[in-house]
């Protein structure tokens, strides 16, 4: 249910493949200190082009060369009354040249024609044709990228663009959100929580993220600890040695912008009170 918009400052971004889909998680706190998580699906992608240039290079020719790289055939036929076949594979006159929508490859959700300026070398700002490969998840993207890069014909014929860019950085770029900035999102409470945050919101996509021009800092909670150990042998203590003990732990916790500081000392035996 939509109640209102909520503003919070992000402190951590994470991305995972969940149920065969890539999802982005943004964690942070509101100005009143409530922990917040926003998550949404995202489709990672990269671009592929040909190293050769000229008028014969088009989006469709790139796609054809890509399919040749993997020895995949795309054959489309019109219905044939002669052979009573819905897709006749016997009569050449019924065959047609594959169209853009006929190309399909497992793991790739869709192929998108794209034109952009190649920053390598001098191109006089002329755009070159490329094909944008959109994937369902990061596993499929990494697998397909490796298949192209480690193919024997890759260095000779193909170029990959932005294939090593982390999808999290891509989300920040396209949404114009900074890694530790303030953002505003619609207050859609999720029906099934995946975290222990006070507020968890599930969005449709990254377009629901609105960056805010705020310089204040949310009351993030900082925790620190220090341990004192005993070593049976005098060497560095080992957790696998039962005689090497942690005999004292010191803890502090503070919320940013607030003077209260929590101090806790834990000891395996009574100790003298600190001054």
Segments predicted by a language model, with ranges:
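The two-metal-ion catalytic cores of nucleic-acid processing enzymes
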Residues: 1-275
């Amino acid at each position: 249910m939509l109640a209102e918009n909520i503003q919070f400052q992000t402190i951590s971004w994470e991305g995972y493949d969940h149920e065969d889909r890539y999802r982005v998680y943004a964690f942070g706190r509101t100005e009143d200190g409530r922990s917040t998580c926003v998550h949404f699906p995202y489709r990672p992608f990269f671009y592929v082009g040909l190293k050769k240039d000229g008028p014969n290079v088009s989006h469709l020719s790139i796609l054809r060369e890509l399919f040749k790289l993997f020895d995949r055939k795309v054959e489309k036929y019109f219905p044939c009354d002669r052979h009573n076949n819905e897709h006749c594979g016997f009569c050449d006159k019924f065959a047609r040249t594959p169209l853009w929508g006929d190309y399909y490859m497992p793991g790739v959700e869709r192929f998108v024609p794209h034109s952009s300026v190649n920053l390598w070398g001098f191109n006089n700002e002329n755009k070159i044709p490329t094909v944008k490969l959109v994937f369902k998840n990061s596993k499929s993207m990494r697998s397909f990228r490796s298949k192209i890069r480690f193919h024997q014909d890759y260095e000779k014929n193909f170029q990959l663009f932005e294939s090593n860019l982390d999808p999290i950085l891509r989300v920040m770029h396209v949404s114009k959100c900074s890694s530790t900035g303030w953002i505003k999102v619609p207050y859609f409470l999720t029906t099934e929580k995946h975290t222990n945050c006070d507020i968890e919101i599930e969005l449709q996509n990254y377009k629901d993220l609105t960056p805010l021009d705020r310089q204040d800092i949310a009351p993030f909670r900082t925790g620190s600890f220090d341990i004192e150990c005993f070593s049976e042998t005098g060497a560095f203590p080992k957790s696998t040695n039962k005689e090497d003990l942690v005999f004292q732990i010191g803890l502090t916790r503070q919320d940013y912008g607030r003077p209260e500081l929590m101090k806790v000392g834990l000891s395996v035996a009574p100790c003298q009170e600190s001054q």
